[in-house]
């Protein structure tokens, strides 16, 4: 079967974990890994897996995009460089899946709004953040039952799973996640907090979601909605679990989650990376299926719907 060829930018924790997932994909074929350090472990690992590599950043990839048929690129670098990376690749008709908190394209949380983006012919979609991917489905599960006036999420991840890129982008993480809690989750006001826990052995990713509903919460409907949404997320992140809740206290609905990774590249405690890379891969697969079916054509700076 034909596969859509992909490039990965950023051979760090997220880029490397994503590479393993793309290797299993029925519709995506990773062919390039882009970095900036010739001695990086991630580039060496990509070469071992048969990918072409460059240590000259995106500029090292551009001359090969057309020849190697690259149609989708994943950016797992940093919010600071993403806009330029996206501009250069969009011009060549490459669809960009943004795994940084840059958020220049629309937010995408697969179980909530992935289908909308595929039908709009976007050239850049943003995967929010790991905390956003884990918690926004829960905010959306409450807000689809009744209006949420405030949504707050707290993502706790092990220090070991947060590489230099994540640490550089902490402020962007909180801003981008809070924005997506509102735009995708449906809360009128959103707030996001990230905690890096240095405990050894490293702790699994844990997330807490608090929603304040405008009227008294319909406990049965909200509980059913949350359980249905958990099942949707588990389709691509099997280690996504409801640990406690929903707990109702007046108008507050609290949900406690745990995310265990598949252990593709980093150990299973790094569910924060896993949910991000799984969501990115799921999103790209959805676009790839549309391209393969002839319903979507990528051109310079635009995606044309059939």
UniProtKB/Swiss-Prot annotation:
Gene Ontology process terms (BP): catabolic process
What Enzyme Commission number does this protein have? Answer: 1.2.1.10
Alphabetized SUPFAM superfamilies for the sequence: Glyceraldehyde-3-phosphate dehydrogenase-like, C-terminal domain (SSF55347), NAD(P)-binding Rossmann-fold domains (SSF51735)
Sites where the protein binds NAD(+): 161-169, 272
- Which keywords belong to this entry? Aromatic hydrocarbons catabolism, NAD, Oxidoreductase
Protein family according to the UniProt entry? Belongs to the acetaldehyde dehydrogenase family.
What is this protein called in UniProt? Acetaldehyde dehydrogenase 2/3
UniProt source species: Azoarcus sp. (strain BH72)
The coding gene here is: mhpF
